[in-house]
Swiss-Prot record:
Its main location: secreted. This is Signiferin-4.1. Expressed by the skin glands. It comes from the Eukaryota. Inhibits the formation of NO by neuronal nitric oxide synthase. Keywords: Amidation, Amphibian defense peptide, Secreted. One of its GO terms (biological process) is negative regulation of nitric-oxide synthase activity. It comes from Crinia signifera (Common eastern froglet). It is found in: Secreted. The modification Serine amide is found at residue 15. One of its GO terms (cellular component) is extracellular region.
């Protein structure tokens, strides 16, 4: 879902 996608992107940016 969108939440999963957003979380994945956020994690990528955070890294």
């Amino acid at each position: 879902g969108f939440a999963d996608l957003f979380g994945k992107v956020a994690n990528l940016i955070k890294s």
